Amino acid sequence: MIAIIDYGMGNIRSVEQALKHIGAAYIVTSDKEEIFRSDGVILPGVGAFPKAMDVLEEKDLVRVLQEIGRSRKPLLGICLGMQLLFEKSEELQDCNGLSLLPGVIRKLKVPYKIPHMGWNELKKEGEIALWNGVEDGSFVYYVHSYYADCPNEIVYGISEYGVKVPGFVAKGNIYGAQFHPEKSGDIGMQMLKNFKGVVETWKSSQLSI
């Protein structure tokens, strides 16, 4: 069972539809016990970083997500949800994040239209489980004005938009997509299928303990 975190700032409906499409069992929840009982977690998000962190704090989900991230349970952040995984953001004000990944969220300062919205090429950097069946140079769908300034060793996908935008990051059990896999057609569905596979592998490993 995959828990989709519902904190009032997520693209919940489209993520639900995507998981339904790939046959994944899921629950939409903000209940701590349900999140801990799940086999994997998706943290979606649309909106401002400081507001999102305030809401997560109010719902006592900051601690929950940090515990999930520091365990071996698979965690996938999408768009703002990915940004929240980092140490802090410069959006509106300096604001601390979940600190599960090293790096800072900074405003895109490019001679192009902001937000970066639409389809862009994703170049793979290294291999991870979520790349199974995903061709290098596939196009994915973005909507964002900020990006992760983070170490190269956690970047597994890059798009160009005046700067190199980390489109996909990963460290251990933690994954983050700056783009929207649930809106990225067959390629996005394949990535979500791969995440489902990672979740199932983790669940099997727990049953054997």
Swiss-Prot record:
Enzymatic reactions: 5-[(5-phospho-1-deoxy-D-ribulos-1-ylimino)methylamino]-1-(5-phospho-beta-D-ribosyl)imidazole-4-carboxamide + L-glutamine = D-erythro-1-(imidazol-4-yl)glycerol 3-phosphate + 5-amino-1-(5-phospho-beta-D-ribosyl)imidazole-4-carboxamide + L-glutamate + H(+); L-glutamine + H2O = L-glutamate + NH4(+)
Metabolic or biological pathway: Amino-acid biosynthesis; L-histidine biosynthesis; L-histidine from 5-phospho-alpha-D-ribose 1-diphosphate: step 5/9
Keyword Lyase: yes
UniProt cross-references to SUPFAM superfamilies, sorted A to Z: Class I glutamine amidotransferase-like (SSF52317)
PROSITE patterns: GATASE_TYPE_1
E.C. numbers: 4.3.2.10, 3.5.1.2
Glutamine amidotransferase type-1 domain residues: 1-205
Active site per database record: C79 (nucleophile), H180, E182
Entry keyword set: Amino-acid biosynthesis, Cytoplasm, Glutamine amidotransferase, Histidine biosynthesis, Hydrolase, Lyase
Superkingdom classification of source: Bacteria
InterPro entries per the UniProt record, alphabetical: Class_I_gatase-like, GATASE, Imidazole-glycPsynth_HisH
Gene Ontology annotations for the cellular component aspect, listed alphabetically: cytoplasm
Pfam families assigned to the protein according to its UniProt record, in alphabetical order: GATase
Subcellular location(s) of the protein: Cytoplasm
GO MF entries: glutaminase activity; imidazoleglycerol-phosphate synthase activity; lyase activity
GO terms of biological process kind: L-histidine biosynthetic process
Family matches, as HAMAP family: HisH (MF_00278)
Role noted for this protein: IGPS catalyzes the conversion of PRFAR and glutamine to IGP, AICAR and glutamate. The HisH subunit catalyzes the hydrolysis of glutamine to glutamate and ammonia as part of the synthesis of IGP and AICAR. The resulting ammonia molecule is channeled to the active site of HisF.
Subunit structure: Heterodimer of HisH and HisF.
Name of the molecule in the record: Imidazole glycerol phosphate synthase subunit HisH
